[in-house]
From Swiss-Prot:
Molecular function GO terms recorded: amino acid transmembrane transporter activity; beta-alanine transmembrane transporter activity; L-phenylalanine transmembrane transporter activity; L-proline transmembrane transporter activity; polyamine transmembrane transporter activity
NCBIfam families: 2A0310 (TIGR00913)
Name of protein: General amino-acid permease GAP1
Lineage: Eukaryota, Fungi, Dikarya, Ascomycota, Saccharomycotina
Native source species: Saccharomyces cerevisiae (strain ATCC 204508 / S288c) (Baker's yeast)
One of the record's GO cellular component terms: fungal-type vacuole lumen
Keywords noted in UniProt: Amino-acid transport, Cell membrane, Endoplasmic reticulum, Isopeptide bond, Membrane, Transmembrane, Transmembrane helix, Transport, Ubl conjugation
Length: 602
């Protein structure tokens, strides 16, 4: 089979080096210098000698690269996204902490209480455990792609490149909407969390303004500000969850102030599953799947951050593998403790909202067993978790806007990136949308946010499913173009079958969400309730079909043999890369078996 792609046939003037096509125009661009942090800096970005002038100049736009007008639209997009002006300032420790603790938020700390009430303790382990296997496989697939293509937009660009332009348009717009809506939601959640200490509601707007300003300021420090903030936030969350697990073991064994061994008492009375009939118990398990998926939202941020990391080839695989620990240690063990310490019929869980810190099973477990002071500490951590998600919202949404603009899905102005690597227009638009949080003082607050959330409620599932399909399609393209896995510096431990499993689980969760939307737990069916839970599904379908009609593109997938699997690669010298991989394998072969197994999975 020939290794010559359609891109090479249409562009014979381009250079070819070790099997990789390199556009000759890259050789004529203005000179650049490569500093130790890995960022490409144009000569016109050097300092003027005046700090004030340098500060003003830092907001000026990085000159967009020029591409050959004779190239196809897809080829232009591939080149533009590969030459991202975003800065490479995220270090290994940043990615590690983002992977371990970045997604720990209200879904686990508060939302797990609702899941416990509707499903029971056994349902918690089934729901989070099953969802965790999907998340692990998805992140491993994303890690493989992100190491090869650390390009602008990350996985939001892969969908357009490896699946289909219409799929990328619909999926990526929905992903942008998710984070656009999340910012005001999290700011309001933070202002509600403060009520735990009996704060007067009249100060709600003041707290909204304070939290909004704090999140915006962090992001104005660029990716370095985001990375440092997430490092601190995640470290605090991780320490708290580990501390709770240790405390939970002590309390369960009778070491608390109230004394008395608990063991598996609450698994027998009131029971392991909520509900009186098999049908009710099954519905409870389905509802837990929905909450579990929500709690894992943000797990894909490691892939988005890859394009701004110093050394993605080494840092991204390490960070991706940390997901194993987040799932097993921070989710499964903490939820096991919750199920052992709090019965699913506890009155504090009834009628609680997803942002009510008093309804956090972590707080309830501590309060119930007579420990004073710690509930306030946990509430502070919940507040930090909420602000962490808000911080990630501006980061993810602004970068997604840049990628959408580079793919011609948004006006070109949204691709504005200044000399400090900040997507200023994206940050400004996302921050402005966050001002909707001031509706917190309105009586219609709940209704407004329910419908805002409905617009992107299933966004994470679409994103995760899209990543799995991208990985499957990429592997098919390698085979179709006569390329081997030996040119991959990092291969997903779960392989392509892991992506098939992840896609299967995403479909199962869509079905579970549909079932719960039609037949809600503890409530009667209603059209309003259904669309609040499932509105984003028809919305994505409308965007997908609408784009197909507009572009008159009726192909389901880009043919595997025509996919561009070269532009944007981190390493262009495949022979050198293969040699380095062989050396790394030889070194690993000298290690003990237990270490090799550990390194493969973790």
């Amino acid at each position: 089979m020939s290794n010559t792609s359609s891109y090479e046939k249409n562009n014979p003037d381009n250079l070819k080096h070790n099997g990789i096509t390199i556009d000759s125009e890259f050789l004529t661009q203005e000179p650049i210098t490569i500093p130790s942090n890995g960022s490409a800096v144009s000569i016109d970005e050097t300092g003027s000698g005046s700090k004030w002038q340098d500060f003003k100049d830092s907001f000026k736009r990085v000159k967009p690269i020029e591409v050959d007008p004779n190239l196809s639209e897809a080829e232009k997009v591939a080149i533009i996204t590969a030459q991202t002006p975003l800065k490479h300032h995220l270090k290994n420790r940043h990615l590690q902490m983002i992977a371990i603790g970045g997604a720990i938020g209200t879904g686990l700390l508060v939302g797990s209480g609702t899941a416990l009430r509707t499903g029971g303790p056994a349902s918690l382990l089934i729901g989070w455990g099953s969802t965790g296997t999907m998340i692990y496989a998805m992140v491993m697939a994303l890690g493989e792609l992100a190491v090869i293509f650390p390009i602008s937009g990350g996985f939001t660009t892969y969908a357009t490149r490896f699946i289909d332009e219409s799929f990328g348009y619909a999926n990526n717009f929905n992903y942008m909407l998710q984070w656009l809506v999340v910012l005001p939601l999290e700011i309001v959640s933070a202002s509600i969390t403060v009520n735990f200490w009996g704060t007067d509601p009249k100060y709600r707007d003041g707290f909204v303004a304070l939290f909004w300003l704090a999140i915006v300021i962090i992001n104005m420090f660029g990716v370095k500000g985001y990375g440092e903030a997430e490092f601190v936030f995640s470290f605090i969350k991780v320490i708290t969850v580990v501390g709770f697990i240790i405390l939970g073991i002590i309390l369960n064994c009778g070491g608390g102030p109230t004394g008395g061994y608990i063991g598996g008492k609450y698994w027998h009375d009131p029971g392991a599953f909520a509900g009186d009939t098999p049908g009710a118990k099954f519905k409870g398990v389905c509802s837990v799947f929905v909450t579990a998926a929500f709690s894992f939202a943000g797990s894909e941020l490691v892939g988005l951050a890859a394009s701004e990391s110093v050394e993605p080839r080494k840092s991204v695989p390490k960070a991706a593998k940390q997901v194993f620990w987040r799932i097993t240690l921070f989710y499964i063990l903490s939820l096991l403790m919750i199920g052992l310490l709090v019965p699913y019929n506890d009155k504090s869980l009834i009628g609680a909202s997803s942002v009510d810190a008093a309804a956090s099973p972590f707080v309830i477990a501590i309060k119930t067993h007579g420990i004073k002071g710690l509930p306030s500490v946990v509430n502070v951590v919940i507040l930090i978790a909420v602000l962490s998600v808000g911080n990630s919202a501006i980061y993810a949404c602004s970068r997604t806007m840049v990628a959408l603009a580079e793919q011609r899905f948004l006006p070109e102005i949204f691709s504005y990136v200044d000399r400090k690597g900040r997507p200023l227009v994206g940050i400004a638009v996302t921050s402005a949308f966050g001002l909707i949080a001031f509706v917190a003082a309105s009586k219609k607050e709940g209704e407004v946010f329910n419908w805002l959330l409905a617009l992107s409620g299933l966004s994470s599932l679409f994103t995760w499913g899209g990543i799995c399909i991208c990985h499957i399609r990429f592997r098919k393209a390698l085979a179709a173009q006569g390329r081997g896995l030996d040119e991959l510096s990092f291969k997903s431990p779960t392989g392509v079958w892991g992506s098939y499993w992840g896609l299967f689980m995403v479909i199962i969760m869509f079905i579970a969400q549909f079932y719960v939307a039609v037949f809600p737990v503890g409530d009667s069916p209603s059209a309003e309730g259904f669309f609040e839970a499932y509105l984003s599904f028809p919305l994505v379908m409308v965007m997908y079909i609408g784009h197909k009609i507009y572009k008159r593109n009726w192909k389901l997938f880009i043919p595997a043999e025509k996919m561009d699997i070269d532009t944007g690669r981190r390493e262009v010298d495949l022979d050198l890369l293969k040699q380095e991989i062989a050396e790394e394998k030889a070194i690993m072969a000298t290690k003990p078996r237990w270490y090799r197994i550990w390194n493969f999975w973790c």
